[in-house]
């Protein structure tokens, strides 16, 4: 059993720039052996992986990690507290699900998690530098995409099954025609002159 003090979690978010739905974050703790196994299975920056590759990596990440967690912040929370605070809230929710806090967290990007009481390191393009951040990126993206795919059945005029909530032309056009749902980020779409 590894010493709990040696545990390092990679953290990443997805969905910050979307017009629809929550922002998701994942945190993943990997051993050196886990890292090697996942890298050999094709783990890398989620943006460089196809949907099928990411989808196939999810069970491998879950079974080849010491621990993994998911957190989210709703569209309403984003509207009330802003995207940066909501993103941090999603990350904190993921991190707080670990049975013991990691000794160090590796955060993708330049901004630290302000309310995290422990040690942290930020890294621009972190998913290209740390396997744990790459794994967190894959879990967050696939988990959010699955939710949006389910919601697309109910809110079918916005093209969500393809755009995953991002502001594509069909999404923006139908927001103007049909109006926003309760899952749209009102603070993000106010410039589109939507009711």
From Swiss-Prot:
Cofactor binding note: Manganese or magnesium. Binds 1 divalent metal ion per monomer in the absence of substrate. May bind a second metal ion after substrate binding.
First-level EC class: hydrolase
Positions annotated to bind a divalent metal cation: 12-13, 108
Keyword Metal-binding in record: yes
Cellular component aspect of the GO annotation: cytoplasm; ribonuclease H2 complex
Pfam family, one: RNase_HII
Cofactors, names only: Mn(2+); Mg(2+)
Domain of life: Bacteria
Protein EC: 3.1.26.4
Localisation per UniProt entry: Cytoplasm
MF-aspect GO terms: manganese ion binding; RNA binding; RNA-DNA hybrid ribonuclease activity
Keywords from the named record: Cytoplasm, Endonuclease, Hydrolase, Manganese, Metal-binding, Nuclease
UniProt-listed InterPro entries: RNase_HII, RNase_HII/HIII, RNase_HII/HIII_dom, RNaseH-like_sf, RNaseH_sf
HAMAP family from the UniProt entry: RNase_HII_B
NCBIfam families: PRK00015.1-3, PRK13925.1
Protein name: Ribonuclease HII
């Amino acid at each position: 059993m590894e010493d709990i003090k040696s545990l390092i979690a990679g953290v990443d978010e997805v969905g910050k720039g979307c017009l629809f739905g929550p922002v998701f974050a994942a945190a993943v703790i990997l051993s050196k052996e886990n890292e090697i196994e996942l890298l050999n299975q094709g783990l890398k920056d989620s943006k460089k992986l196809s949907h099928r590759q990411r989808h196939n990596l999810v069970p491998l990440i879950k079974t080849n990690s010491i621990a993994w967690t998911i957190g989210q912040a709703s569209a309403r929370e984003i509207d009330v507290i802003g995207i940066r605070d909501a993103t941090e809230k999603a990350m904190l929710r993921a991190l707080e699900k670990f049975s013991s806090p990691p000794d160090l967290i590796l955060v993708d990007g330049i901004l630290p998690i302000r309310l995290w009481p422990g040690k942290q390191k930020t890294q621009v393009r972190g998913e290209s530098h740390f396997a744990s951040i790459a794994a967190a990126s894959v879990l967050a993206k696939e988990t959010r995409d699955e939710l949006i795919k389910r919601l697309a059945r109910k809110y079918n005029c916005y093209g969500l099954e393809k755009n995953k909530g991002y502001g594509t032309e069909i999404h923006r056009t139908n927001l103007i025609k049909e109006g926003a749902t309760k899952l749209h980020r009102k603070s993000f779409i106010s410039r589109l002159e939507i009711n």
